Amino acid sequence: MPPHRWTPVWKIAESGHTGVVRVTVRVRPGSAHTRVGGGHDGALVVRVTARAVGGQATAAALAAVAEAFGVRRHAVTLVAGAASRTKILEVAGADPAALDRLLTL
């Protein structure tokens, strides 16, 4: 794979006593429904109804990922990709098994 690709899809980083899952996501703004699931080029696909204007799609994607992992919105942090459809997120307190489940949807 070329070096510019965002891999791996996820990794677990231990931060003190709390596990953090780092996830690469591919945001698809302007979708008919908000949905998290499936994969695209090694990234978790996040479909949001919000348009990619003024950070609305990014905010909607962070909220959707939080709901999909069963954590509060403030537990999801944008690490990279604020102006890109491909983003790296950190999800504090997430179960890594949830990511496996979401990738197979």
Where on the chain are the PLM-derived regions?
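Contiguous, often N-terminal, cationic amphipathic patches that form binding interfaces
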Residues: M1-A63, A68-R73, T77-L105
